[in-house]
């Protein structure tokens, strides 16, 4: 019997703490252990997971799924032995998409991804804006990330309170 899939939001209230790097490395490490892993760039405004994974030239991305222009299966790419869902790098429609993103739609997409994987790691955006709250709320678990500075610890604590 297959274990219940795990969805983990990797989050922090502060930028520059290593969320994206941790998401990529944890995903690759789990994949190297034979686990079925998907990683999703939940940072719609400042997407970097695709860059780190060497996938900055993807034709379609998570933004296309959110706007209804693609199906989730169209934006799952294989890299380093894991599945990667990059957000993309189009600047012209990011703010428009952000203003229209509904928590229910993100949860629906997360549900579709969870049917296809054992671990779903979500690289959440920094801060506590709507996009961050949606990324954290859509996951079943949260892994808070901070650096050893007082502002980072306070911001991490605030973010942890959202889960």
Each model region followed by its residue ranges:
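P-loop/Walker-type NTP enzyme "switch/lid" segment
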Residues: 39-115
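Short, solvent-exposed amphipathic alpha-helical segments in soluble enzyme
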Residues: 26, 101-102, 160-162
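Short coil/turn connectors at secondary-structure junctions
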Residues: 3-6, 33-36, 80-81, 116-118, ...
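Conserved catalytic-core segment of NTP-binding enzymes
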Residues: 108, 112-115, 119-163
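Walker A/P-loop phosphate-binding motif and the immediately C-terminal alpha-helix
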Residues: 2-43
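Short, ordered loop/turn segments at secondary-structure junctions
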Residues: 15, 42-44, 89-90, 125-127, ...
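Short, conserved glycine- and acidic-residue-centered signature motifs
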Residues: 23, 99-102, 152
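Conserved protein kinase catalytic domain
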Residues: 11, 50, 63-66, 73, ...
């Amino acid at each position: 019997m297959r274990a219940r899939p795990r969805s983990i939001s990797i989050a922090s209230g502060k930028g520059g703490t290593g969320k994206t790097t941790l998401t990529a490395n944890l995903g690759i490490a789990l994949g190297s252990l034979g686990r079925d892993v998907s990683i999703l760039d939940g940072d719609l405004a400042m997407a970097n997971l695709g860059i780190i994974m060497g996938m900055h030239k993807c034709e379609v991305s998570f933004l296309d799924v959110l706007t209804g222009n693609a199906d989730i299966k169209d934006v799952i790419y294989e890299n380093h032995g894991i599945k990667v869902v990059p957000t993309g790098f189009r600047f012209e429609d990011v703010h428009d998409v952000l203003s229209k993103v509904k928590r229910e739609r993100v949860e629906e997409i997360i549900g579709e991804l969870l049917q296809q994987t054992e671990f779903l790691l979500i690289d959440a955006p920094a801060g506590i804006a709507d996009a961050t709250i949606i990324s954290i709320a859509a996951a079943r678990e949260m892994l808070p990330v901070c650096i050893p500075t007082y502002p980072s610890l306070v911001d991490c604590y605030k973010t942890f309170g959202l889960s």
